[in-house]
């Protein structure tokens, strides 16, 4: 039995003694111990593909901060890599895929990878982390969203214009839907395998959903998020594994995401939580949504913004703080001060206590 189940209770909108907190990219370059591990390993991919290293890095922030969850150390591009698109990282530029998808012929050659073969290192990491956590806090597994993965798979990496995928959306939408359906199948299998290996909550990162117009979002992102929420087997009762759908720029679609079948919606800092809570109408828990740049502020300023965020959620939720998971609106960045993270966690714990 979990010693700390606040996260799972909050995601189910049950009563908790205080608002739980975890942070996107809580294991990352802002931590000196992470940088030391990265230097010793020699590459990001070696860390992500070696279960013992992935476990160590996952646990690093838990040793520093009294967080309410661990999140698997990995990368959303492990699925495209396992599909044969040859993931590599270029220093200072980020991830690149050596075999981008540009036509229907390439899509027909894609297959959903075997989760205990091509992606066994991820599942072994999940199993090892669960063992090392020893039921102290829940472990979150994750995947990129179909749209976000397709962006990388078609562009071959990050992009400012997303010209290739947007051209495909306008000129060959059936081809893009074919890719999105294949990727959705892979995401569902990937998350199910993480759950089977021991993940106790799951999150989908729709990082690039916000680049789409409303019509395009409702055509190329939302239907596939909904498929995941409705088709991913998550169990019942004490064996239930809650799902969070997080997206940058998803504010206009919260009401629709709340009806997708997910347990929770993660939002960025471009919408007030009060507004998000009203739009979700009590159908889902909400996760977020402190601007990550707040961590560049003083501890007093951080505490002030924590209070404002907590109050904003309650104002939109009938005065109640239940059903809220505190998080940033996006991930930690390398220049952040670990002491300011400590101040953030302390403020959330102190100010949210019931």
From Swiss-Prot:
Signal peptide: none
Positions contributing to substrate binding: 25-29, 75, 152, 207, 330
Subcellular location: Cytoplasm
GO molecular function: uroporphyrinogen decarboxylase activity
InterPro entries according to UniProt: UROD/MetE-like_sf (IPR038071), Uroporphyrinogen_deCO2ase_HemE (IPR006361), Uroporphyrinogen_deCOase (IPR000257)
Site-annotated residues for Transition state stabilizer: 75
Catalytic activity: uroporphyrinogen III + 4 H(+) = coproporphyrinogen III + 4 CO2
Pathway assignment: Porphyrin-containing compound metabolism; protoporphyrin-IX biosynthesis; coproporphyrinogen-III from 5-aminolevulinate: step 4/4
GO CC entries: cytosol
The protein, known as: Uroporphyrinogen decarboxylase
Native source species: Xylella fastidiosa (strain M12)
């Amino acid at each position: 039995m979990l010693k700390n189940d606040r996260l799972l209770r909050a995601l189910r909108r049950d009563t908790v003694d205080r608002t739980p907190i975890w942070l996107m990219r809580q294991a990352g370059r802002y931590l000196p111990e992470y940088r030391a591990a990265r230097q010793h390993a020699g590459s990001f991919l070696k860390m992500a593909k070696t279960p013992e290293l992935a476990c160590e890095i996952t646990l690093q922030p838990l040793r520093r901060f009294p967080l309410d969850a661990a999140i698997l150390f990995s990368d959303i591009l492990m699925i495209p890599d396992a599909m044969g698109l040859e993931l590599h990282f270029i220093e200072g530029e980020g991830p690149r895929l050596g075999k981008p998808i540009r036509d229907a012929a390439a899509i027909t050659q894609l297959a959903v990878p075997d989760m205990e073969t091509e992606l066994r290192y991820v599942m072994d990491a999940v199993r090892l982390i669960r063992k090392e956590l020893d039921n102290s806090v829940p472990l979150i597994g994750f995947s990129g969203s179909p749209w976000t993965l397709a962006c990388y798979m078609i562009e071959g990496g990050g992009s400012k214009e997303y010209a290739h995928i947007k051209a495909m959306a306008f000129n060959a939408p059936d081809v893009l839907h074919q890719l999105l359906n294949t990727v959705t199948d892979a995401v569902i299998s990937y998350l199910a395998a993480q759950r089977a290996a021991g993940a106790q909550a799951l999150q989908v990162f729709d990082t690039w959903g916000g680049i789409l117009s409303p019509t395009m979002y409702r055509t190329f992102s939302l239907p596939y998020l909904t498929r995941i929420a409705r088709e991913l087997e998550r169990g019942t009762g004490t064996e239930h594994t809650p799902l969070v759908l997080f997206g940058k720029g998803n504010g206009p679609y919260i009401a629709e995401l709340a009806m997708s079948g997910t347990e929770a919606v993660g939002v960025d800092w471009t919408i007030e939580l009060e507004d998000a809570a009203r739009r979700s109408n009590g159908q889902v828990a909400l996760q977020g949504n402190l601007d990550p740049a707040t961590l560049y502020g003083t501890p007093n300023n951080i505490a002030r913004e924590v209070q404002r965020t907590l109050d904003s959620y309650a104002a939109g939720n009938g005065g109640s703080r239940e059903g809220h998971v505190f998080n940033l609106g996006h991930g930690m960045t390398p220049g952040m001060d670990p002491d300011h993270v400590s101040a953030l966690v302390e403020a959330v714990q102190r100010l949210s206590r019931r």
